[in-house]
Swiss-Prot record:
Cross-referenced CDD domains: BRCT_DNA_ligase_like (cd17748), LIGANc (cd00114)
Gene expressing this chain: ligA
GO aspect biological process, one term: DNA replication
Protein's UniProt keywords contain NAD: yes
GO molecular function: DNA binding; DNA ligase (NAD+) activity; metal ion binding
Annotated EC: 6.5.1.2
Keyword line: DNA damage, DNA repair, DNA replication, Ligase, Magnesium, Manganese, Metal-binding, NAD, Zinc
Originating organism: Salmonella arizonae (strain ATCC BAA-731 / CDC346-86 / RSK2980)
Binding residue positions for Zn(2+): C408, C411, C426, C432
Family that this chain belongs to: Belongs to the NAD-dependent DNA ligase family. LigA subfamily.
Any one annotated GO CC term: cytosol
Protein's name in the database: DNA ligase
Domain BRCT: 593-671
Amino acid sequence: MEPIEQQLTELRTTLRHHEYLYHVMDAPEIPDAEYDRLMRELRALEAQRPDLITPDSPTQRVGAAPLTAFNQIRHEVPMLSLDNVFDEESFLAFNKRVQDRLKSTENVTWCCELKLDGLAVSILYENGVLVRAATRGDGTTGEDITSNVRTIRAIPLKLRGDNIPARLEVRGEVFLPQAGFEKINEEARRSGGKVFANPRNAAAGSLRQLDPRITAKRPLTFFCYGVGILEGGELPDTHLGRLLQFKAWGLPVSDRVTLCDSPQAVLAFYHNVEEDRPTLGFDIDGVVIKVNSLALQEQLGFVARAPRWAVAFKFPAQEQMTFVRDVEFQVGRTGAITPVARLEPVQVAGVLVSNATLHNADEIDRLGLRIGDKVVIRRAGDVIPQVVNVVLSERPEETRPIVFPTHCPVCGSDVERVEGEAVTRCTGGLICGAQRKESLKHFVSRRAMDVDGMGDKIIDQLVEREYVHTPADLFRLTAGKLTGLDRMGPKSAQNVVNALEKAKATIFARFLYALGIREVGEATAAGLAAYFGTLEALQAASIDELQKVPDVGIVVATHVFNFFAEESNREVIGQLLAEGVHWPAPVVINAQEIDSPFAGKTVVLTGSLSQMSRDDAKARLVELGAKVAGSVSKKTDLVIAGEAAGSKLAKAQELGIDVIDEAEMLRLLGV
């Protein structure tokens, strides 16, 4: 594998992890600024090598998948995200791109708004009556939060006024003002309840309560900023006009919305808002800048995951100084040992910060960090900040060096650092309690074996009570044993047992991904499954044979080979099969031999599928010899268009590319 391929793999793995924590669990571990930096780095590398862009890259999608505790709702019009800029130069470059695409030398009129730090929602009104509300989710599918949204007093249950469209989907942000956030935390401290890290987490936690009565007690509010579905009516032909119309119908709109007729005016707006930020009474992390004219918006169109006519201009991450009191070491799923700085607690952007990740030994060396040092930390709205630098001029005399452990802090096994890698790892494997927990959490996750209802807290208890040591042990659990866990009644226990039984029927690619082999993500697992066809063939493959799989280089091939060479891993796999885990035999990829209409073709999926998940469709297409791409180009052979297919479908039609619908895809797949 080329160095750039290795970088791309690591970046995508890291970004997917943090997307899950942020969008699904509402428990982010890194600041927005660090996530944005990682995304910029990934975009830059993919721009250098567009041939290495994969359909499942974070740059080719909108967000993350929703939880299954709520009913899922498919957005008829996808809820796209915005691209970001971080400085004046980048904004001016964006402004120029817009003018160049419009072939205009005249200034564009911009509509500028606050970028609220809350939770994006969609609210559907039919004949003026609120009938449905959903979270953004992954942009295509969200969670049904209608009952909770109805409790927010700022959101009208019925619109007022005349000429209201028959179906109108309003989009906006639910957020928690600072005063309400402080009140919730005060009450939590008194009652021993959960104290939220910041207003965004509090808003998300409040909005996603299964009991609407809890949501009703939280002082949530809402500003609208856009529209999705529009049927049986008309709206003004400018963005500002639409916001004013929403306000006339009784929907709340920020009073800081401003029209700017030049890029200089936009910059002035940005700096004014930045200056006023501490006095607003609620959290924002930048401003949103949109082309005001709807006709020009339509002319500009969209890229894969964002409109070309809008951008988020984000504020710089906020910084404070504090002291490092100690460094502890945490162990992850693959044995990676991560140093964590324990800080003298300090308020950063309204949140009390007491720890920061230090990533690895190289980062500690780069910083020249010692325990007791005064450091600058940076935070951009989330929980765990980053250490920017050491204030050497104020280094206390009593500092001491940070000593990386030679044995795992959890299980006592030896640690190793492979030459050329930055990460130090525990060699204990599944005898290590920390690795065991994280491995099992990965195994049951939605994109792996998809065991509904088996959350992190259940896994923690199962490992701590020594009920489970390997993934195979999960399938031996009984409802009686599960009932003994905290907050687990007989009905819930039986539901988990049923979910485990259901999960036994999987597909080969998911099973491989669930095993947690280093560097083997979903795309690589699908490629391995499709190429070798059977578990036996994959287990017997040499490193050279493994490298014949598309996008598998020497590093990944070595990890896969070593995994299957380990007797304990083969034993666990045998136990899983003995417990009834099974999958249909995949078709081996060989475009010359496969009798399939998809063999050797580059296929693009767009829109929502109703009969099959997108992941399963991709896996099946790959098994039948297709290459699934994330964007439409002249090299695309076929586009499969589901419901609410958007710009990809339009581009396919423009290029004269063959298009089929979901029903035809299922027929060709033999489903």
